[in-house]
Amino acid sequence: MTKAPSQLRVIPPHVPAHLVFDFDIYADARVGSDVHQTYSAAIADAPDVFWAPQNGGHWMVQRMDAISAIATDPEHFSVREMQIPRVPNPPFFIPLSLDPPENLPYRRAMAPMFGPVAVKAMEPRLRAWAGEIIDAALQKGTFDFMADVAKVFPVSVFMELMGMDLSRLHEFRDLAERFFENQNDAAQIEALSGQILGVMKALIDEKRSTPDDKLMSHFIQADMGGGRTMSEDEILAMSFVLFLGGMDTVTNVTGFAYQQLAQMPDLQARLMADAEGLSGAFADEAVRMFGVVNTPRLVVKDIDLMGVPFREGDMVLNLLPIGSRDDRKFDQPHVLDIDRKKVAHVTFSTGPHLCIGHVLGRAEIKVLTEEWFKRVQSFSLAADKPRPFRTGTVMALEALPVSVNAAS
């Protein structure tokens, strides 16, 4: 029987034996529902940069300085392919699949809708949504925080921002989940990409006929310089990455953070007593500790860096969530400490591909936490309930059953 790509061990001749460390990013048995802690422990004895022979073979980068060096060197490490293992027709994302300076006009087109001023203006609506969603969940007593809160709130925000039909939330959320669940299946990725592009094409057609003040209409009308507007293919490629990011990233950061918070009654009491004063610090620490995106790069020019022979055609995976827990940069990196002095991390990447939505993501977690502790006195993990998870290029907590004591 032919082995699946994840089972075959691929070690090219240029990879030194001392840099080889077995790890399957999609299904490593050492990783559990406390994904970040167990993931870090599983590779603790690996080199700072190591070759994982599974999934076609690729480099993995776990230290913050090394991640930053690769993320800021597009001459050698390109974003034009972002699938591990490599696939024949990789999805094309704008601006993620463009190296600088080609990505810059698109980032400029997006920036006004995601900057601090725009996000601040959204806050009343964020707060209203969060309250409605939490109130509905609390009626159940014991419920799945992921299904009833974390998979609803950020996705609602994204869909409203884009001008999408909120009644299709669960349909669109399911599409995004299946895309990330099948990262090592080229045929599934191609089929699901086609479905997502079909959704976005329909939205483009709708907004051309009936423009509004939402993000899709902004893309259609955006001046890219010299009076040029984006082609439909450009808008589709940009919308594709926003669809995936908006449906999955903040959802899972929030889920992992609340899984940890459910086990910290003392911190819950502090947030209950002063959510408005402490929610910003909680959001900052949640983002540092519970990043979910690992960013691939394709080596396009040979380079020896940090004692590692990167060769053209190699795939590289920057482990952003692990880099943000680098014990050379953070004291007690696996402890959720809202009193920690705010310091730089790489959860949102760095350099030319710093996540455009990082201000909005932080605001969503902050507002949700304030509204949660207006209504919740304490909560805990529901006993003996499984907490399934997903790893890969985007990590996810798929269920988080909790028991809640509502505030009086």
Set out the residue ranges of the language-model regions.
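Cytochrome P450
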Residues: 1-408
